[in-house]
């Protein structure tokens, strides 16, 4: 085991000492608990926390990139569906059926979307 001489503030020393005293009151024997052992345990714990934080910084979730990618996918989907609806409305199999006229399909979609959005984001009376 490596030996390290370390200078700490009186406040830190008092806190480490308080942990040692608490463990002794909980029944730990003097030979099982010491300031040195407790300080070593706290240093190891702090090192693990530090390493975990560094890993999170390296592989951090980028909300802006996620939002950009999500918006791009939504716009592509919206554009694709609009083209498909336009093509479908010109099909001879549905011609003459008002349910499949482009303007009616768009209005129907808007109503359904508005209804679903209202479920999750109720309109305030103030708006």
Curated annotation (Swiss-Prot):
Pfam families: Tra_M. InterPro entries: IHF-like_DNA-bd_dom_sf, TraM_DNA-bd, TRelaxosome_TraM. One of its GO terms (molecular function) is DNA binding. Keywords: Conjugation, Cytoplasm, DNA-binding, Plasmid, Transcription, Transcription regulation. It is found in: Cytoplasm. Signal peptide: none annotated. Gene3D superfamilies: 1.10.287.2320, TraM protein, DNA-binding (1.10.10.450). One of its GO terms (cellular component) is cytoplasm. Homotetramer. 2 homotetramers cooperatively bind to DNA although they do not contact each other; cooperativity is achieved by DNA kinking and unwinding. Part of the relaxosome, a complex composed of plasmid encoded TraI, TraM, TraY and host-encoded IHF which binds to the F plasmid origin of transfer (oriT) in a site- and sequence-specific manner. Interacts with TraD. Also interacts with TraY. Conjugative DNA transfer (CDT) is the unidirectional transfer of ssDNA plasmid from a donor to a recipient cell. It is the central mechanism by which antibiotic resistance and virulence factors are propagated in bacterial populations. Part of the relaxosome, which facilitates a site- and strand-specific cut in the origin of transfer by TraI, at the nic site. Probably autoregulates its own expression. Plasmid specificity is conferred by the TraD-TraM pair. Belongs to the relaxosome TraM family. This is Relaxosome protein TraM. It comes from Escherichia coli.
